[in-house]
Amino acid sequence: MNIYDQLQAVEDRYEELGELLSDPDVVSDTKRFMELSREEANTRETVTAYREYKQVIQNISDAEEMIKDASGDAELEEMAKEELKESKAAKEEYEEKLKILLLPKDPNDDKNIILEIRGAAGGDEAALFAGDLLTMYQKYAETQGWRFEVMESSVNGVGGIKEVVAMVSGQSVYSKLKYESGAHRVQRVPVTESQGRVHTSTATVLVMPEVEEVEYEIDQKDLRVDIYHASGAGGQNVNKVATAVRMVHIPTGIKVEMQEERTQQKNRDKAMKIIRARVADHFAQIAQDEQDAERKSTVGTGDRSERIRTYNFPQNRVTDHRIGLTLQKLDTILSGKMDEVIDALVMYDQTQKLEALNK
């Protein structure tokens, strides 16, 4: 099947989806309706571009016909030639765009995410850097019009982040932030360093797609739920009613503790949202580990401990080791202006996949 047959098949399926989503039987089936809605949303951009491409092809044909029929009208012929030139340039652009749009899509790209950041090697300095990363992602989310909600956080004595869990919601969140999972290294002079020596510390980032209950169901008998009293700074009990929730997925040992909310039910709901994402991610990672060939065509190895980026403060430099990108814009990037880095990662990933398809 050539690219044009593929595009026509996508358009035909898109029109079929529109009809299915109006079917009362589909509307009443929540799971199927969500699946079909997601499929329609995932193909909309491709169909729109394909329809625009077909219009460009028509414009080329019309311009060529106009040149033939100009009958010595120099002004009309010149106008038609200009239209032909512009349309041919647009045709090439659309063909490249459509090749990328036809690449196999990550089914999670349109999903919200659970973002986890932890201070790793480097003690207090690592925790402080984890806080810097949290601020960077919060500010980037603002630029994208996303909602950023801290669900659980643990702060150390110097105000750094031991661990933070956040929900980021909005359009195409996972597609842009999925490349952030891995070890982020910082090189700078800590505020406590009297000799002015540069120290190296690390924080880890984990990005997981949000998983809806209808997509991944956890058997309640696989969960152990403990209820306890929330505690504040210094460990004092801050609530007379037991509202904090500890949830353990017994088969995997994955554990979530939640005490941010004032009610047990809200803490339970948030804990469930996180544990569902972690368990689904756990099994997805196992499946991905078994597909070495596919992993080679993506950015990085997929290893969660892989060092993906270095932030060098003395040189105001950010280096993404996976794609060899170096930018002297550390202050800009940490202020939330991450587009240049993320766009480069997306483009690299798409290029690798196109090359793999053409082999």
From Swiss-Prot:
GO terms for cellular component: cytoplasm. Coiled coil: none annotated. Its main location: cytoplasm. GO terms for molecular function: translation release factor activity, codon specific. Pfam families: PCRF, RF-1. Methylated by PrmC. Methylation increases the termination efficiency of RF1. It comes from the Bacteria. This is Peptide chain release factor 1. It comes from Streptococcus agalactiae serotype Ia (strain ATCC 27591 / A909 / CDC SS700). The gene is prfA.
